[in-house]
Amino acid sequence: MKLSLSSPPYADAPVVVLISGLGGSGSYWLPQLAVLEQEYQVVCYDQRGTGNNPDTLAEDYSIAQMAAELHQALVAAGIERYAVVGHALGALVGMQLALDYPASVTMLVSVNGWLRINAHTRRCFQVRERLLYSGGAQAWVEAQPLFLYPADWMAARAPRLEAEDALALAHFQGKNNLLRRLNALKRADFSHHADRIRCPVQIICASDDLLVPTACSSELHAALPDSQKMVMPYGGHACNVTDPETFNALLLNGLASLLHHREAAL
């Protein structure tokens, strides 16, 4: 699996791995790259079955497989210890990595994540699946911003959204891969295992997220032994895109306080 690695800003700089959500594209993290690369070696990638890592996914594709293939790719690239920043599905992969490879994961950041899928989130995906079956890729892509962004943010950026739609349609991961990745997301359940995650965890959520209720992050915070939770008042599900200044400040402060503190203790 292909990875994109930035140059380390100094010798032995900590590694931060960015894992996007259901869309799977590493470019999702573009608003974070410049600030992170000043202090960390940053790893981005298109998830298997998407972008520049095309593949046909098995029907039983799982979050555990997503975690294993990423860890193997990191080890092959010479990276054995790393922090993980995951958005939604990416946060699930991050938790799986922390469970399966505890010696490797130094810290986890969960952005609008959850322990197991909330009934509201499941309902949103059911609506989106119906759109996919009835209207194909175009209907899925055109509906996607409604679940990602606040209404006023979208209204002020109509040309940008049109360009994003065209790009997403041109690089659509395919119906079968999308549904198999979505099914993996829906099957994931960390409610009985989260207390075994021992690395520090920063939880970031947005209070106006239409797709994932903030209660999901509260449940994560209660279940994870070494976690702290920050709530952004605005930004929607893709709060790192819509309000990068606020998000980046929270992320950088979290990495500095949790990751560096852990490294100093080792």
Swiss-Prot record:
Its EC number is 3.5.1.-. The keyword Hydrolase applies. It is an enzyme of class 3 (hydrolase). Keywords: Hydrolase. Gene3D superfamilies: alpha/beta hydrolase. Residues 14-115 form the AB hydrolase-1 domain. One of its GO terms (molecular function) is hydrolase activity, acting on carbon-nitrogen (but not peptide) bonds, in linear amides. One of its GO terms (biological process) is nitrogen utilization. The keyword Hydrolase applies. It catalyses: carbamate + 2 H(+) = NH4(+) + CO2. Involved in pyrimidine catabolism. May facilitate the hydrolysis of carbamate, a reaction that can also occur spontaneously. Belongs to the AB hydrolase superfamily. Hydrolase RutD family. This is Putative carbamate hydrolase RutD. The gene is rutD.
